[in-house]
Amino acid sequence: MDSNTVSSFQDILMRMSKMQFGSSSEDLNGMITQFESLKFYRDSLGEAVMRMGDLHSLQIRNGKWREQLSQKFEEIRWLIEEVRHRLKITENSFEQITFMQALQLLLEVEQEIRTFSFQLI
């Protein structure tokens, strides 16, 4: 993963952790957890692509990697919808900027994971 993406993830996670949404703070914590999970998944998929010969061991280790990939895309779609919803309802400019950047990052990561997965197929 390039350093800009790493710092973007870290920056967004830090800013999201500072937000308070009252009764929906559990939802925000869930989003943060999914962001972190997505970052780790993207990193591991990228490393597998960089080793290219790792496809065979990836398939042996986890015969359900396509199912996991599908699940990650569902998580990304859910996060995108959740971020869009938060963006629509918030009036705080700090939160708007954070969610706009989170949305952009999610779209970039979705594309990167698609690229990695096509290289692994």
Curated annotation (Swiss-Prot):
Single GO BP term: exit of virus from host cell nucleus through nuclear pore
Keyword vocabulary terms for this entry: Host nucleus, Host-virus interaction, Transport, Virion
Record has Glycoprotein as a keyword: no
Cellular location(s): Virion; Host nucleus
Motif (Nuclear export signal): 12-21, 85-94
Additional note from the record: Average number present in a viral particle is estimated to be 130-200 molecules.
Function description: Mediates the nuclear export of encapsidated genomic RNAs (ribonucleoproteins, RNPs). Acts as an adapter between viral RNPs complexes and the nuclear export machinery of the cell. Possesses no intrinsic RNA-binding activity, but includes a C-terminal M1-binding domain. This domain is believed to allow recognition of RNPs bound to the protein M1.
Name by which UniProt lists this protein: Nuclear export protein
Organism of derivation: Influenza A virus (strain A/Duck/Hong Kong/2986.1/2000 H5N1 genotype C)
The gene coding this protein: NS
